[in-house]
Design a protein with these regions (language model features):
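Hydrophobic transmembrane alpha-helices of multi-pass solute/ion transporters
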Residues: 10-89, 99-118, 241, 255-329, ...
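Transmembrane helix-loop junctions in multipass membrane proteins, especially transporters and channels
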Residues: 39-42, 59-64, 103, 136, ...
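Juxtamembrane membrane-interface segments at transmembrane alpha-helix termini
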Residues: 58-68, 152-159, 176-180, 281-292, ...
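Extracellular/periplasmic helix-exit of transmembrane alpha-helices
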Residues: 91-100, 219-233, 280-305, 334-339, ...
Length: 478
């Protein structure tokens, strides 16, 4: 098909099979394919697989052998193994926490902190605490979120305001928790250690969280329930304690998870220790090994007529299979696009105009949010900028931890307020509130991009320590 120029990309020579125009058209076609599929209700992983097939056919047409295409796809699958294992362990952990009463206990004692004068603040705090344990915004909205919405409705609080506080808190953990799938995908994509990224994202989390607390305190002055009926809260607690295990010892695995994270233990050993502690708690609580295994694999399913059945069901390895397939398909697609130079060719004209740190942070933010807006999913918003911008961060001598943090602050945190994204629509469906009604009140979601760009303007970024090629050598293995 002709001769192609070789360019150094991320410390290696890559043959550019496509012209910049062809590369842009291919990426546009991939985005449109995914967008149309989402609108038609087709599963994301199927559309990513179709995009992978389209890219493979175009690559073969440009002269690359099927064997080399397979090698490139295999590299992507290999790179995804770390985050896939983490997500698998998290899915098992959530299933067991729902079965043995850990989540019910957390909700039970969480109600003790409800105060009418700071109701919205407490909704945000409780939601964020649960999300820091579950690591998923949808899971948080589906558990504590439903309960808090029911309590708020009994007090006549506006649904959009309360849903905004719930969603804001839910995305704290979706972005920052040790059990967060998106966070580990960011680490894998950018080639940094999950433990280092977990610590580094707190540099913007803390000011954003404090600003969000201030926002909900002020908002609570406008939307304040006259009183919280103690009987209503006691009723919720009695329903929980009457039908599910509630005991303080069940919180020990959650404390262990957080303590090991603070002690800088790597996430996989951390999850394995936490799973072991959870297994022991389940046995102590009277669950048989067979029942524990069933919840670990298929998730927990209480009887449909029990109160909170919809709240405390789910989890399990098989419930995460679609997410695992999305990650593997996205990493394989990105690997093939990298190997053919498509991403570099398509974005080179933009990347060449980035000369300062503020421009770099802004470009990362826009690329990441655009990924959510076009592909409706966090995965594309993480993988594409996490791959495309690494060489630009290297050129400006900015550490890849900053790249990971910026993606977390934008493609993950802000995805909750992109009205047509799955990250926003799922909590909306669970809570029964339209996305546009809670967007103005989901303060954390729209403050995160602002804070991370302010950090960029002020030059508060970590400078590069390692050459890019050396840093990537063991990215997934670590």
């Amino acid at each position: 098909m002709g001769s192609y120029k070789q360019l150094a990309v991320d410390g290696r020579q890559v043959k550019m099979l496509f012209s910049p125009r062809q590369a842009q058209l291919l990426l546009l076609g991939i985005m449109l394919l995914i967008a149309v599929g989402m609108l038609l209700g087709i599963k994301v992983y199927l559309m990513l697989a179709a995009a992978l097939l389209l890219t493979a056919i175009c690559t073969r047409w440009r002269g690359k052998s099927w064997q080399k295409i397979g090698v490139a796809v295999g590299k992507g699958l290999y790179r995804s193994r770390h985050v896939v294992l983490i997500l698998a362990l998290i899915s098992i952990l959530i299933g067991l926490w729902k079965q043995n009463g850990t989540l019910a206990t957390l909700i039970y004692y969480g109600f003790a902190f409800i105060r009418p004068e700071v109701f919205l603040v407490m909704v945000f705090v409780l939601s964020s605490l649960v999300s820091m344990l579950l690591g998923t915004a949808v899971g948080t909205a589906s558990t504590i979120g439903i309960v808090l919405m029911g309590l708020a409705q009994s007090m006549g609080m506006p649904g959009g305001v309360v849903a905004g506080a719930i969603v804001a808190g839910a995305f704290v953990g979706d972005r920052s928790a040790p059990t967060s799938g998106p966070l580990h995908l960011i680490a894998t994509t950018t080639g940094v250690r999950s433990e280092e990224l977990l610590r580094y994202v707190f540099s913007t989390l803390i000011p954003t969280y404090l600003l969000s607390l201030g926002f909900f305190y002020l908002l609570g002055l406008l939307y304040r329930p006259e009183a919280v009926d103690p009987g209503t809260i006691r009723g919720f607690q009695e329903l929980l304690a009457g039908h599910y295990p509630v005991a303080l010892y069940l919180l020990l695995p959650t404390l262990l998870l957080l303590a090991l994270a603070v002690c800088r233990l790597e996430i996989i050993p951390n999850l394995l220790f936490t799973l072991t502690a959870t297994f022991i708690c389940s046995l102590y609580g009277g669950f048989s090994p067979a029942a524990i295994f069933q919840s670990a694999l298929w998730g927990y399913s209480p009887a449909a007529d029990l109160p909170f059945a919809a709240v405390l069901s789910g989890g399990g390895l098989l419930s995460f299979r679609a997410i695992l397939l999305v990650v593997m398909a996205a990493m394989s697609l990105t690997s093939l696009l990298e190997d053919t130079g498509v991403i570099h060719q398509a974005m080179a004209s933009v990347l060449d105009h980035i000369h300062t740190v503020p421009q770099l942070i802004l470009a990362t933010s826009l690329f990441s949010i655009l990924g959510v807006a076009v592909a409706f999913t966090q995965t594309v918003a993480i993988v594409v900028p996490g791959t495309v911008l690494q060489s630009t961060y290297q050129r400006l001598e900015v550490d890849r931890l900053v790249l990971g943090r910026t993606i977390a602050d934008t493609g993950v945190a802000a995805s909750g307020i992109v009205p047509w994204s799955s990250a926003a629509m799922s909590p909306a469906l669970v809570l029964g509130v339209p996305v546009l009604e809670f967007v103005p009140y989901a303060a954390y979601c729209w403050l995160s991009p602002l804070v991370t760009n302010i950090f960029g303007l002020l030059g508060w970024v970590k400078r590069n320590r390692l050459p890019l090629d050396k840093g990537r050598e063991g990215e997934a293995a670590r």
